[in-house]
């Protein structure tokens, strides 16, 4: 017996409650076994981190529902947080994580070469995003701002400054 990602997603709709929501879901089907990977997001945490307790609660509830609707299903269930250096869902996460350091890979208008940098989002106006170069530990330095088109951003992740 197998289970689809749509079925799991439907179950999670009934299991999850705000501020915790689904970040991603993967269901890998094998001939006699399913690997179900659920990644969670916390909308109220500055970095979107989900606690171990929240992961356990979702795992327990999802397991109960799976066993109720599909008792013969052979599966492995992994429930986790999206993580501190999660991949950003662009462009929405640029607004959500404004002011928090992010690592961006982008194409500049001057060259087609990929560039990478660590920035803080200052403002977003339509397809334009104003960024401030992140400088670790330097508080009194004049902040250099740059503007990018959203279409030039190839990928982004949160950046944890340790």
Curated annotation (Swiss-Prot):
Q: Which coarse location class applies to the principal site listed for this UniProt protein?
A: cytoplasm
What superkingdom does the record give? Bacteria
User: Do you know which InterPro entries this protein is assigned to?
Assistant: Ribosome_maturation_RimP, RimP_N, RimP_N_sf
Coiled-coil regions listed in the entry:
none
State its location(s): Cytoplasm
Q: What keywords are assigned to this protein?
A: Cytoplasm, Ribosome biogenesis
Homology family: Belongs to the RimP family.
By its UniProt entry, which PANTHER family does this protein fall under? RIBOSOME MATURATION FACTOR RIMP
HAMAP family in the cross-refs = RimP (MF_01077)
What name does UniProt use for this protein?
Answer: Ribosome maturation factor RimP
Its organism's taxonomic lineage begins at: Bacteria, Pseudomonadati, Spirochaetota, Spirochaetia, Leptospirales
- Provide the gene name from the record: rimP
């Amino acid at each position: 017996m197998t289970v689809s990602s749509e079925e799991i997603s439907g179950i999670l709709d009934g299991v999850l409650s705000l501020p915790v929501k689904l970040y991603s879901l993967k269901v890998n089907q094998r001939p006699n076994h399913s690997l179900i990977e659920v990644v969670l997001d916390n909308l109220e945490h500055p970095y979107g981190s989900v606690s171990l307790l929240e992961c356990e609660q979702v795992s327990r509830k999802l397991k109960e529902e799976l066993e109720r609707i599909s008792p013969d299903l052979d599966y492995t269930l992994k429930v986790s947080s999206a993580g501190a250096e999660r991949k950003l869902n662009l462009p929405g996460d640029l607004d959500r994580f404004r002011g928090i350091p992010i690592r961006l890979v982008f194409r500049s208008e001057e060259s087609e070469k990929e560039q990478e940098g660590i920035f803080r989002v200052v403002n977003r106006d339509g397809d334009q995003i104003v960024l401030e170069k992140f400088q670790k530990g330097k508080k009194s330095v004049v902040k250099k701002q740059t503007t990018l088109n959203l279409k030039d951003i190839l990928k982004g992740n949160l950046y944890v400054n340790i």
